[in-house]
A protein has these predicted regions:
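Mixed-charge, low-complexity intrinsically disordered regions
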Residues: 1-77
Length: 77
């Protein structure tokens, strides 16, 4: 997986790890917000990688972005 992603709502996140759910062994993405209090989140990998429909268009929930692009946004915040 790439390191930085832009959520469809616009915020930037950094993927820290891929973990396993203890009961189901499902892959989980551990990721950190690059804004505010820099909260750490976990979400099923399948959901992290899925496409969603928004305003009649199918888009990725999290779009990979370059480290350079992420740094530009992070430095503005």
């Amino acid at each position: 997986m790439e390191k930085y992603y832009r959520h469809f709502k616009g915020n930037i996140y950094k993927v820290l790890h891929i973990a396993k759910h203890s009961e189901t062994l499902e892959d989980m993405v551990v990721y950190q917000a690059m804004y505010g209090d820099k909260s750490i989140w976990v979400r099923p990998k399948a959901m992290f990688e899925e496409s969603i429909e928004r305003d009649g268009k199918v888009i990725r929930r999290f779009e990979p972005i370059s480290e350079e692009e992420a740094e530009k946004v992070i430095n503005i915040i």
